[in-house]
Amino acid sequence: GSGFVAVEIPFTPRVLELSLEEARVLENLGADPSNIRFQPVKVPEPSVDETIQILKFLPDKAIDLIDEAGSR
């Protein structure tokens, strides 16, 4: 693959560069890095729960934080 992943977050298109190590891990898991942009990002449930707890006084920021973490 090219080492780049296109990520589209509503109203914010981004292109992220995969490190060589990340690309190798994805390939070992059977993922084709060139098709990653077509796959949904899965955020582990504990991460979502923890984010919501940390940001419960700023609920509008919780989704932004999850989006940002998922884009990395």
UniProtKB/Swiss-Prot annotation:
InterPro entries in the record: ClpA/ClpB_AAA_lid (IPR041546)
Compartment list: Plastid, Chloroplast
Molecular function in Gene Ontology: ATP binding
Pfam families reported in the protein's UniProt record: AAA_lid_9
Domain of life: Eukaryota
Keywords: ATP-binding, Chaperone, Chloroplast, Nucleotide-binding, Plastid
Family the entry assigns: Belongs to the ClpA/ClpB family.
Protein name: ATP-dependent Clp protease ATP-binding subunit ClpA homolog
